[in-house]
Amino acid sequence: MQPHTQPPQPEASSSRAVHIPSDPAPPRPCLTNDAIVSRWQSSPGFQYFWAWIKRRCDRLKGKEIIRGPFDHSAHGIRSLMNMLDQMTSWVEDATPQPQSNQRFGNLAFRTYNKLLQERLPPLIDSWDIPSNLRSQLLPLFINSHAFGHPTRLDYGTGHELAFVLGLWCCVVPGWVGGDNGTEEEEDELILRVFTRYLELTTFLQKTYNLEPAGSHGVWGLDDYCFLPYLFGSAQLLGSNLTPSASLSLALSHHPSATSPPSAPITDLYTLSLHHLTLFKFGASFSEHSPLLYSLSQMPNWVKPHGGLKKMFLGEVVGKRVVVQGIWVGGWCWGEDVPNVEERGDKNEGKGTDAGTKAPWAR
């Protein structure tokens, strides 16, 4: 295990001139009330993270998602990709149970999650990462349920955010990119690793019939995810693929399409539209996803991307019902992480923001 290292301090040019502790406080479930959630957005750790997200968006313009062999990627990228590949294979050891009365959630997902808790720590230990990174990473992946919640049998934007916070933590000590690598490695965290994560979580959603966590129903953006739309719209800024063409391309990849797709999917926005169509059916796209449909009517990606940035801060990071399950430590907050008693899972994911029932639902 490598010794503690001083995380590289962000440069002023990237709007990340904040202090991140080299000996960070251990993560804890502290986002349990609206006041603390509001404070989190102004904390040094979150400001660093948000600047990193915006920097990635700036650099993703015109770039395609990366698939295929990763033998020549940096060590950190290879380690994360191998982890996601192994996690996919663990499904074979937790085959779905027959379902009768449950609309959502196969109980075998609890078996899968138990395997994750047992197998993920030694796997990460084998990477020889800095000990201060390990202490931040495992609670984000395991305690924050970055791959879905075993009790509620659901998955949503809070779980997705926990995983991306974990990716960013890999950058903080320079294990990926940072002072010890290149920004291309950090871009690859999104274009390759995050893409692979989305494939895994979509597979888990389908295999175990996971319920959307905190869904707003017809009036939400997407029942399961948010960040791929933000990153994907950044990829498509200035692209010849218009929002309308992106939707058409996604629909052409649906298994029920009567003709072959006109082109491969090369961006996260269109990929997520495609994933969405695998779960929603029985109504037109404009009916089951009106917000995404309205974005498809825009002439270019400038307004959609800007609006998604604001929506991320307001409807994802700013909503206690979304983030309260995330374990936040010294890198994700900075100094003086709030010390709030853990309240367990019974209220996690519950809140005053009730989902909206689709008009065709009975």
UniProtKB/Swiss-Prot annotation:
The gene is RRD1. Coiled coil: none annotated. GO terms for cellular component: cytoplasm; nucleus; protein phosphatase type 2A complex. Residues 1-28, 339-362 are annotated as: Disordered. It catalyses: [protein]-peptidylproline (omega=180) = [protein]-peptidylproline (omega=0). This is Serine/threonine-protein phosphatase 2A activator 1. Keywords: Cytoplasm, Isomerase, Nucleus, Rotamase. One of its GO terms (molecular function) is protein tyrosine phosphatase activator activity. One of its GO terms (biological process) is mitotic spindle organization. Its main location: cytoplasm. It comes from Cryptococcus neoformans var. neoformans serotype D (strain JEC21 / ATCC MYA-565).
